[in-house]
Design a protein with these regions (language model features):
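Bacterial N-terminal signal peptides
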Residues: 4-15
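C-terminal and inter-domain tail/linker signature
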Residues: 20-332
Length: 332
């Protein structure tokens, strides 16, 4: 890690405490604000919202006037919804299926409020994944672990929750199979509603051996994927913004970008020394919002919303230097 995690997170906790000092908005309050936003979005009426004079809105990394972009094309709400509230930082992230021109799709929405409960930051990741939205709506409800409180005796600090979540990104970036991967045995990951771990083989195909395969498999466990060393082509995971943390439930939401440079990172060696060529053949980037469930220092559940973006895309919230860095960033 290129920075002092403890120092950065200490500043982040202080920044979150500023909102709390002004007048805390609890879980129900934050969820109510998110619901109000989604209703105003479908009504195409930003005037229904309580907005700060300096409110900032981005959509897939682009700064827009509030009411533009997805506000023009949205036609309804879907049936899947997952709220993650950070009462300390005054922020909430919502994963939700929606309708755009009548078609199912997914959004990851981040809202930040001030001490008067006015919206100051609105960030939307719009994922045009009709199949993913249908998958989530077939699942119906968020996985129980995301809604379950961690026993008080097992709760840890915000800094510790972020530290464990960040090990996921650090372990995937230029993955070599030799890192420390804090996965629980029951770890599972959904990506735009689809299983990317522990998935059944298509047509009854057998599970490949992680120790001899040349491409990683969605049939493997979280740990098997990382220990295979076959994710090396994820050249960089940057602009890692850990903006919402729920200590009560052991949840962390990060926004980030996964870069595939299509260059030398495609040629690498597996942990046992085999030479492999894998990964995208043209440069491109995933823009991603990723939710982690952490218990007793291990990752149990992971859920991601992502959309393909131009290579090197930035979030619209970070400086150029921070947007290109893999350091931990925190709520301001």
């Amino acid at each position: 890690m290129r920075i002092g995690i403890v120092l950065v997170l200490a500043g982040w906790v202080f920044a979150g405490g500023e909102v709390a000092a002004q007048g805390k908005c609890d879980r129900a309050c934050l969820e109510g604000i998110a619901e109000q936003y989604l209703d105003a979005l479908v009504a195409k009426d930003p005037k229904k919202l309580s907005l700060a004079s300096n409110v900032k809105y981005t959509e897939n990394g682009q700064r827009l006037q509030l009411g533009d972009g997805f506000w023009n094309s949205v036609t309804g709400r879907g049936t899947y919804k997952l709220h993650v509230a950070d009462q300390t930082a005054g922020q909430i992230v919502t994963f939700s299926t929606m309708r755009e021109a009548g078609n199912p799709m997914i959004i990851a929405l981040r809202l930040k409020i001030d001490g008067s409960r006015r919206l100051t930051e609105i960030e939307t990741l719009v994922a045009h994944s009709e199949g993913g939205a249908k998958n989530l709506e077939t699942i119906g409800q968020p996985r129980a672990a995301f809604l379950r409180a961690t026993p008080p005796a097992d709760r840890v600090s915000r800094a510790e929750l972020v530290r464990v979540a960040n090990m996921y990104f650090s372990g995937m970036q230029l993955n070599d199979g030799k890192g420390q991967y804090p996965f629980a045995d029951d770890c599972d990951r959904l990506e735009n509603g689809g299983k990317t771990t522990n998935a059944p083989g298509r047509g009854g195909a057998p599970k490949p051996d992680p120790k001899t395969a040349s491409n990683y498999s969605a049939m493997w466990t979280c740990r098997e994927q990382f220990e295979s060393g076959l994710l090396h082509f994820v050249m960089r995971i940057r602009d890692r913004r850990y903006l919402v943390v729920d200590e009560e439930r052991g949840l962390v939401v990060a926004f980030a970008f996964f870069d595939h440079d299509a260059g030398a990172s495609r040629q690498f060696k597996t942990p046992d020394g085999r030479s492999v060529t894998a990964g995208p053949v043209v440069p491109w980037t995933w823009e991603i919002a990723e939710l982690f469930k952490v218990e007793k220092g291990l990752l149990h559940e992971i859920e991601a919303i992502l959309e393909r973006a131009p290579y090197g895309m930035t979030s619209g919230w970070s400086s150029w230097e921070d947007g290109m860095s893999d350091k931990i960033q925190f709520a301001r």
